[in-house]
Amino acid sequence: DHTALSPRDELVLTDQQMPGSPLGIPSGATGPIQPNYWRAVEYSAQHMAPSPAGANNFRCQPRAGQNPVVLIPGTATNAYSSWSMMSEELTRRGYCTYTFNLNGVPHSSFISLTGDMRESAKGLGAFITMVLTRTHTDKVDLVGWSQGAGPLPNQYLKFENGASRVDHFIGLVPSNHGTTAYGLNLFLNSTTSKLGAHFDDSMALLNGMSAPQQLQGSDFNKTLYDTPVTQPGVKYTIITSTHDHVVVPYTN
């Protein structure tokens, strides 16, 4: 529904939309609930832009005391592979859920959120505006994982005036402060090595800047986290695991 978007927001979403996901909304058939992440990845690679069960029903009206829930995928994942189970569960419990595919690998329908996270934050903001307008609500709750639990929503909240539109932000194993990648950050970080500058250039060609941005010590992380990141008025819940082998150390 383009009428729910300002020309600016429509331009942002159109610029970042992926095959099968106009304005970020997966247009494929609803996929089955998957018992684990890798089966969901396989299914999304074999089917064009499947939608997780229950998601993106813009006729859904939140119950009293509830906000629409925007589910944010992780790096190089997609709406379905990230949320095939949780979207259905939240919908079954009466929540209105929304999720998206944006700013991914060129020409891919299922590898999203690989691009510059500063741009993805603008896309997230435009998507949230669309949700608020079409559900006639003032605020959303955010639930995300990995990039979608840390740097992306934090960039939106801190630099895109997102705090005025978010009530509760729940982050699952977020990549806050980046990852050392078991020491590779020392070689791949453009702020510390010439090799890192070449890595940035290579990732930019693939619309993959979210990878170097999520290295510990990156310019992106310094800008986002070197000053207070939490925003007044937003409730934060962070859930992490000592068994996380991607975001290392897990305390990041």
Indicate where each model-derived feature is located.
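Serine-dependent carboxylesterase/thioesterase catalytic core
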Residues: 73, 120-224
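Catalytic nucleophile-loop/oxyanion-hole region of alpha/beta-hydrolase
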Residues: 107-123
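Extracellular/periplasmic catalytic domains that process cell-envelope and extracellular macromolecules
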Residues: 61-65, 90-92, 134-135, 143, ...
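Conserved alpha/beta-hydrolase
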Residues: 88-108
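C-terminal catalytic-base region of ester-bond hydrolases, centering on the histidine
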Residues: 229-252
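Flexible, membrane-associating and regulatory peripheral segments of lipid-active enzymes
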Residues: 1-89
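Alpha/beta-hydrolase active-site loop signature
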Residues: 76, 104-106, 176
